[in-house]
A protein has these predicted regions:
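Polybasic/polar functional segments that serve as interface/processing modules
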Residues: 1-67, 71-151
Length: 151
């Protein structure tokens, strides 16, 4: 039976700051900071800017890869981090990305790669988090909807 080969994290960031998502230099710097903070070794780096908006940036790492795809019109960013070994800290990379893109809501899915003998691998762990202001807005909308039905 094979043991765990690597960690694969997919991160969906909703409600990101619009202007940052189409700024090539900002996203590059953010991604390089995330690679460094996650104790990963950069081998190669490539970027493509789409017209009229959006970016795809890929980092080939000694430990795996990291990709960032931005969708400015949707205020959405999709991130993919795959690492092998125990020396890297992909969760630290996520912290850097969250601080830079400032999403209102984030969904992180953790997948254990190569853990063939584990049934728990069949169900990835999913973590949701929402900013406090988003919770206030959502609650306010629910209260308003409830009160408007009462009449």
């Amino acid at each position: 039976m094979l043991g765990l080969i690597g960690k694969h994290l997919t991160i969906d960031m909703y409600g990101c700051i619009f202007k940052t998502l189409d700024d090539v230099d900002f996203v590059k710097e953010t991604m390089l900071a995330a690679v460094k903070e996650g104790n990963m070794t950069l081998l190669n780096f490539t970027c493509h800017k789409f017209e009229p908006q959006g970016l795809t940036i890929l980092a080939l790492l000694a430990e795996g890869h990291m990709s960032v795809h931005t969708y400015p019109t949707m205020s959405y960013t999709a991130v993919d981090i795959f690492t092998i070994g125990e020396q890297s800290s992909p969760n630290q990379s996520i912290r850097v990305l969250k601080q830079s893109f400032k999403p209102e809501k984030i969904k992180t899915t953790n997948i254990k790669r190569g853990d063939v003998g584990s049934l728990s691998d069949m169900k990835p762990k999913i973590k949701l988090s929402t900013t406090p202001m988003r919770r206030v807005r959502d609650t306010s909308a629910k209260v308003f909807k409830f009160l408007s039905r009462s009449r």
